[in-house]
Amino acid sequence: MSSAPTDAFFRTPLSERDPEVFAAITQELKRQQDQIELIASENIVSRAVLEAQGSVMTNKYAEGYPGKRYYGGCEFVDIAESLAISRACQIFGCSYANVQPSSGSQANQGVFMALLQPGDTIMGMSLAAGGHLTHGAAPNQSGKWFKAVQYGVRQQDSQIDFAEVEELARTHRPKLIIAGGSAYPRTIDFARFRKIADEVGAFFMVDMAHFAGLVAGGVYPNPLPHAHVVTTTTHKTLRGPRGGMILSNDADIGKKINSAIFPGIQGGPLMHVIAGKAVAFGEALKPEFKLYAKQVVDNARALADTLVRRGLDIVSGGTDSHLMLVDLRPKKLTGKAAEASLEHAGMTCNKNGIPFDPEKPTITSGVRLGTPAATTRGFGVEEFKKVGELIGDVLDGLAANPEDNSAAEARARAEVAELCRRFPIYQ
């Protein structure tokens, strides 16, 4: 009896091959169609990106780099990766790109391996101030392998405390200074960071995972003229598949990063994901992407303004980007309770600590909201004003009825459903 796959192996659809997984995917599609996604780190990719990521390139091993592989049969995956590299360089105005990191965290780890030795000092924004785990937080590898110094924000306005940055840099002489974060809503003065880095002889790295798409769209400052190296995810505002990327204009750093990614921390790259990255980068080069990026920021400001009118505080007083931190203390609510109630109303977000938060990280005094995904659906300023009113209604209901907010949630959920019907996805 032959052990070779039968014709059914190549023809049987997922719905028949594995009904349980198919059901989970179908239910997730319905969730995305029927809920307003307000998680700042999430977006909705095009059908073209989905097709590329679900392609036969998932079958191919391709250790190495285009033209220098350790496997045969790479001529076509080389095309996809070369397109991703050249398009990334065109988008961000740089001479080097590595598109192989499988996540933003691995992109950061690749930079650390290329430029640092265990025990070196790094400096990044503290998690409590809006930074990211991989910028030196104690539970993360970056906080275990390196001496991590953390800067924060000013108490009066929740913006980067450059006096503290300068003092810490001069005191600790870090080898690497990191700018960027996961919950910082304002533009960052990259030139000032670079000046501080040069003064103490440090490399300057920008993690633009959250705002890369805004840079691509021309509505947020480009860090490449200032940073030695830039890392990013390829999803979030860039609207590609989940993955990472490293950019630079320094050829020597590029060579070190290539070695750090492969063979340093990764083996075979995910070629189906890289194909999806190439498609997304091609989309980001089109004129309509600039309109999208501008709309993301316009929508964020409209949402923030509406929430302020509804009696909520916005950390730092507003936003220059796609995200905002909402301080719930004026309503005497926690982020944990608000996240749950908003999800019951059909609006997905995440609880998030705010600067100088008195609550535990598992509870928090705030929520983080973002506009990229709903903007991709087609929401404009008026729709986001409506979303802000719905959030206000749900939170007011929760403040009045903390044990049972089902009535306010149901009213909001009906209006959320109507908005989602007006702006469908994947029909």
From Swiss-Prot:
Pathway: One-carbon metabolism; tetrahydrofolate interconversion; Amino-acid biosynthesis; glycine biosynthesis; glycine from L-serine: step 1/1
Main enzyme class: transferase
Site feature location: Plays an important role in substrate specificity: 235
Protein family: Belongs to the SHMT family.
BP-aspect Gene Ontology terms: glycine biosynthetic process from serine; tetrahydrofolate interconversion
Catalytic reaction list: (6R)-5,10-methylene-5,6,7,8-tetrahydrofolate + glycine + H2O = (6S)-5,6,7,8-tetrahydrofolate + L-serine
PROSITE patterns: SHMT
Protein localization: Cytoplasm
HAMAP family: SHMT (MF_00051)
Single annotated GO MF: pyridoxal phosphate binding
Modified residues (N6-(pyridoxal phosphate)lysine): 236
Gene Ontology CC entries for this record: cytosol
Record keywords, A-Z: Amino-acid biosynthesis, Cytoplasm, One-carbon metabolism, Pyridoxal phosphate, Transferase
Family annotation (NCBIfam families): PRK00011.1 (NF000586)
Protein name: Serine hydroxymethyltransferase
Organism: Paramagnetospirillum magneticum (strain ATCC 700264 / AMB-1) (Magnetospirillum magneticum)
Annotated (6S)-5,6,7,8-tetrahydrofolate binding sites: 127, 131-133
Function: Catalyzes the reversible interconversion of serine and glycine with tetrahydrofolate (THF) serving as the one-carbon carrier. This reaction serves as the major source of one-carbon groups required for the biosynthesis of purines, thymidylate, methionine, and other important biomolecules. Also exhibits THF-independent aldolase activity toward beta-hydroxyamino acids, producing glycine and aldehydes, via a retro-aldol mechanism.
Cofactor(s) this protein cannot do without: pyridoxal 5'-phosphate
Assembly description: Homodimer.
InterPro entries: PyrdxlP-dep_Trfase, PyrdxlP-dep_Trfase_major, PyrdxlP-dep_Trfase_small, Ser_HO-MeTrfase, Ser_HO-MeTrfase-like, Ser_HO-MeTrfase_PLP_BS, SHMT-like_dom
EC numbers: 2.1.2.1
